[in-house]
């Protein structure tokens, strides 16, 4: 049972920030002011000095000060949350964020940000008169997490963690079989959280076995999502494209280098192959964390950071973990028709490094093309090493965050062998930091104007702003608060909205003073309208989703 702490909701106080924010006219206040006594009572629940971690069986929300790269101190918590500012009356639903939240187990400390065991954070909003917010966090009980807690050390292979090699020849052979079959790879689903079209909610990362169902109300782990097809494979995209009717993803083939483009209908557990895209360079597929789609096409990226079978089978860390950086192998972008499975374009492009794609759309006419936007690191994989936990903790305030931009590919559909890669927006507009983008989902696969990202206010060693980028007017606006690390800004459209940026942006923020809160920005003005405080600090997380409240 989750440990419970009830706090006093204080629905409408002026938001506090280092910047000056005005309430957006589209989102009128409908709640009363909080008293200073209430706020002091809330803050008294957060310890102001270092203490031993609270175990999963402890009561209360006793925690130490937390920074973005420090583990959560208890397995779960649930309670009411105080509101500063005003929630819009239409904001009724639940925001869930997934990400690594536990980097320490027993005496073992993980090496890389991507290693941490998945921690879900939930904030449920009820706007309007009598506004209320409730929150919770909970560890996803994957096989990897349960085994690590039971043994006091990691058992399965994580992003940068290789379990100690077995001593006997027989056990070493067993370890090798486990790696070849994928059984020894993690099922720690610490990347994305997605509402499927049938009401189920899935969390996942890049191993196929990491697809896990959760209960969005309690955050309980329901169990592994069991695919009923025979497609197999060890890895998948961590960011499938999900709509009300389908689930579209890519399955890298490490044996015959290429990718399967597959579709799964809402309500089904069976993936069906749309088509196969062979790789053009290198001995293996490029790392494929995410991809893009248009209304007609799936876009398959092939970058020179490639899966490495040798590194996967090794018992010690390689320079790029499970990958090799092979710029001589070339960089390519492939376009497949979603209805026929036919390849309509396959072009060579300048070297690129992109973990997250933003959106894509089609341009018609005499110069028909597919345009694809991504968070691009100038063809440099240094961002991978930047996310080593020791660097994140020791280099705070140092200007070591690698440069990034909105990279825009233009893929001609006339059979040309080459595509273009340009910068879609002056990188100084967003501090030369760019990652964790979201868009209005109504613009998925279509021409669009706005995206919401984590940018940078330098000097910094990690993205530290929320930034609205305007790809038509070529400008950006940022929210920043000193000492705070925001996670992905997630766009939630106002019901019935017609303007692309009519809604709010939600981000979970970790701060150096040991606090954590959900920040709500007016997406049009990009000004703060509310923050919902947790009684303890929150670790950094990756991606979120929005589940609208059902009508009563």
Swiss-Prot record:
Q: In which tissues is it expressed?
A: Highly expressed in panicles, inflorescences and parenchyma cells of the root stele, and at lower levels in shoot apex, leaf buds and xylem parenchyma cells of the stem.
Q: Which GO terms describe its cellular component?
A: chloroplast
Please state what class of enzyme this protein is.
oxidoreductase
The record's subcellular locations are: Plastid, Chloroplast
Name the EC number(s). Answer: 1.13.11.-
Q: Which cysteines link up through disulfide bonds? A: none
| An example molecular function term from Gene Ontology annotations | metal ion binding
The residues forming the transit peptide are: 1-43
| Pfam families in alphabetical order | RPE65
State whether keyword Iron applies: yes
Q: What cofactor(s) does the depicted protein rely on? A: Fe(2+)
Keyword annotations: Chloroplast, Dioxygenase, Iron, Metal-binding, Oxidoreductase, Plastid, Transit peptide
**List of residues binding Fe cation:** 239, 289, 356, 543
Which processes are annotated in GO (biological process)?
carotene catabolic process
- What binding details are noted for the cofactor? Binds 1 Fe(2+) ion per subunit.
Q: Where is this region: Disordered?
A: 32-73
Q: Residue spans with biased composition (Polar residues)?
A: 59-72
Q: Which family does it belong to?
A: Belongs to the carotenoid oxygenase family.
Sum up the protein's function in the record's words.
May be involved in strigolactones biosynthesis.
Protein's recorded name: Carotenoid cleavage dioxygenase 8 homolog A, chloroplastic
Task: Provide the species name.
Answer: Oryza sativa subsp. japonica
Q: What is the lineage of its organism?
A: Eukaryota, Viridiplantae, Streptophyta, Embryophyta, Tracheophyta
- The coding gene here is CCD8A
């Amino acid at each position: 049972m989750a440990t419970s702490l009830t706090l006093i909701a204080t629905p409408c106080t002026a938001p506090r920030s280092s910047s000056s924010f005005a309430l957006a006219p589209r989102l009128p206040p409908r709640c009363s002011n909080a008293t200073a006594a209430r706020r002091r009572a809330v803050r008294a629940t957060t310890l102001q000095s270092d203490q031993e971690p609270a175990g999963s069986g402890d009561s209360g929300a006793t925690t130490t000060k937390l920074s973005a790269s420090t583990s959560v101190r208890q397995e779960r918590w649930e309670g009411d949350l105080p509101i500063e500012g005003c929630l819009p009356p239409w904001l009724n639903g639940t925001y869930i964020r997934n990400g690594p939240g536990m980097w320490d187990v027993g005496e073992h400390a993980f090496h890389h940000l991507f290693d941490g065991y998945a921690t879900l954070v939930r904030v449920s909003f009820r706007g309007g008169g009598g506004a209320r917010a409730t929150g919770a966090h909970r560890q996803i009980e994957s096989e990897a997490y349960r085994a690590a807690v039971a043994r006091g050390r990691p058992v399965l292979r994580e992003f940068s963690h290789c379990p100690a090699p077995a001593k006997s020849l027989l056990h070493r052979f067993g370890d090798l079989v486990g790696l070849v079959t994928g059984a020894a790879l993690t099922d720690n689903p610490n990347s994305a959280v997605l509402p499927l079209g049938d009401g189920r909610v899935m969390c996942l990362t890049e191993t196929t076995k990491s697809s896990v169902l959760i209960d969005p109300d309690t955050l309980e782990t329901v169990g592994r999502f069991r695919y009923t097809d025979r497609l197999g494979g060890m890895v998948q995209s961590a960011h499938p494209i999900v709509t009300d009717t389908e689930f579209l993803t890519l399955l890298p083939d490490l044996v015959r280098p290429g990718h399967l483009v597959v579709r799964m209908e809402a309500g089904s557990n069976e993936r069906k192959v749309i088509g196969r895209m062979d790789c053009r360079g290198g001995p293996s597929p490029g790392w494929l964390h995410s991809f893009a789609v248009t209304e007609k096409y799936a876009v398959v990226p092939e970058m020179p950071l490639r899966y490495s079978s040798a590194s996967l089978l090794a018992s010690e860390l390689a320079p790029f973990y499970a990958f090799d950086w092979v710029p001589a192998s070339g960089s390519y972008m492939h376009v497949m028709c979603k209805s026929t499975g036919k390849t309509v374009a396959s072009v060579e492009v300048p070297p690129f490094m992109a973990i997250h794609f933003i959106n894509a759309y089609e341009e018609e006419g005499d110069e028909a093309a597919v345009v694809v936007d991504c968070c691009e690191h100038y063809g440099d994989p240094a961002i991978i090493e930047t996310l080593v936990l020791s660097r994140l903790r020791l280099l705070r305030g140092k200007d070591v965050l690698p440069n990034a931009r909105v990279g825009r590919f233009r893929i001609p559909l006339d059979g040309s062998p080459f595509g273009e890669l340009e910068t879609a927006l002056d990188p100084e507009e967003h501090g030369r930091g760019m990652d964790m983008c979201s868009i209005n989902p109504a613009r998925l696969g279509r021409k669009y104007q706005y995206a919401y990202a984590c940018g940078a206010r330098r000097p910094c060693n990690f993205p530290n702003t929320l930034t609205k980028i305007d790809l038509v007017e070529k400008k950006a606006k940022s929210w920043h608060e000193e000492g705070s690390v925001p996670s992905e800004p997630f766009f939630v459209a106002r019901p019935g909205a017609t303007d692309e940026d009519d809604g709010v942006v939600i981000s979970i923020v970790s701060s150096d003073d040991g606090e954590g809160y959900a920040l709500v920005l007016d997406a049009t003005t990009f000004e703060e309208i509310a923050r919902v405080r947790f009684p303890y600090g929150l670790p950094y997380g990756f991606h979120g989703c929005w589940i609208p409240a059902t009508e009563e």
